[in-house]
Amino acid sequence: MTKLTDNSIRRELSPNVTVAISMAVYGMAMCGGMLLIGLYHYRDKPSLGQFLLSPSVILCVVAVLGLLVASGVLVRFLCGSQGRKRDRRYAVIMSLLVIVLVGGIGEAALRIAAVEKHNGTFVGNFHLLPIQWREFADRQRTLLALSKAGKPFTVADDTLGWIIGPNRKSEDGLYEISAEGLRSATQGEVLRNGLGDCRVALVGDSFTWGDGVRFEDSWAYRLEQLLPKGCRVLNFGVGGYGIDQMYLRYKRDVTSWKPNLVILSFIDPDLHRTMSSYGFLIVNQNAFPFMKPRFVLDQRGTPNIVNQPLPKAEEIFMLPYIHDVPFIEYDEKYNRTDWDRPQWWYVHRSYFLRFLTSIYPFSEKDRPFVSDADMHAVNSSLLNAFVDAVHKDGATPLLVYLPNKRDFKKRSPWIPEGLQILQNAQLEHVDLTSCLKRDSEPNHFIPKGKPHGGHYTLQANAAVAACLGPIVQDRLGRATAE
């Protein structure tokens, strides 16, 4: 009787064994997911140092060790004597069904919640990678075709990448462009008419252009009101520009105006735009089908453009994968694993697997030509080249650092990259951070979520002009005295 009871006990699968089998199966699934993520982010040809320190390699090693341990536990209990084999197999099958059910629910939920935008798939604010290049390129091509059919506000330029078209007016009526392509009070105004002996030229990005405010509220216009009568401020700013394009804009478009003073004003993100070779990777709010010049330094430290003539947009957007795009490796914002790859097509079909590989996007900043050291060196060289070019043309240069919202969130002793570069290069400059700190921060920037969010408010534009006014007058006075 006792013997029969012992046999029946052995045939029954204890709860602890069931839990152990389930945990082993779940552990194998989790380690399999980790291995997938690690392999997906693995670099093609890493150096030995990159291989040993690579997060993807470390993740793969941990995943393989986890798989071995979980497999060992599973085999031990499956081959054990406790309980019937059928019950042990049943525990495995139920665990697998749970995994499939969770994966299926996750897949369905992600597909329901996902929203397609011009730059990829989003679930809320979460970017579901990879970006499908063909879909992305088709959206860019559509905008390109529409722009060629009409009279677009922003037009392609073979040298600068893009410029504001002359004699334009924005759809919302906020911006009007002169006959020469500069921001002006009225559309088609001829700014060259009636220029006096005092001219101040501005080159910069959308913060210089005055994004989000009327012409009369831009700091360029307000600065003009603070200068002696007859002194004109000419706004050559263009949204999305990097330091490289500002330099080229001066060299090509500003010199013929023979300015007395040339202000190059920039924010920190402009430094990273310098390290891009494609405008469509810089601007992520909407489709932006423009190319961009890319400088690199030669062995003597001289900046040279590597992608002139600029590639044709029509040809770029016909390529099957972004990895085939010429000069893409020179673009800091290009991450190989952010984009679809043919060998991983089965991952791209599943939103759940895409979610797993998007949870922690690994950095690829160690690529040649896009490191932080390269960024500092290229921008420093271009800023020096700008100063030298302005002096050579007989004018006075003025470098101005414009703070953006991040500058007010960081605490001392943090120094923005732009100021680091200016200080290390020993370039004379004006830092307007303390100028804007006199006001309360909410007055500085247009709230995010609103049109032109993150740019200067009219109060901030007024503050910039008020701080620059005396400095500009002083520099103009020095130039006249010389």
PLM regions: where:
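Histidine-centered active-site loop/cap adjacent to the catalytic His
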Residues: 2-7, 15, 449-482
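Serine-dependent acyl-ester chemistry module
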Residues: 4, 26-49, 94, 268-422, ...
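N-terminal membrane topogenic signal
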Residues: 9-26
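Membrane-embedded alpha-helical segments of integral membrane proteins
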Residues: 22-77
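Internal/C-terminal transmembrane anchor helices
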Residues: 85-111
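Membrane/wall-proximal cationic-aromatic binding patches
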Residues: 114-226, 334-357, 361-363, 416, ...
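Conserved SGNH/GDSL esterase-like catalytic core that processes O-acyl groups on lipids
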Residues: 168-169, 176, 183, 201, ...
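Generic structural signal for small/hydrophobic residues in well-ordered secondary structure
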Residues: 205, 246, 262, 390, ...
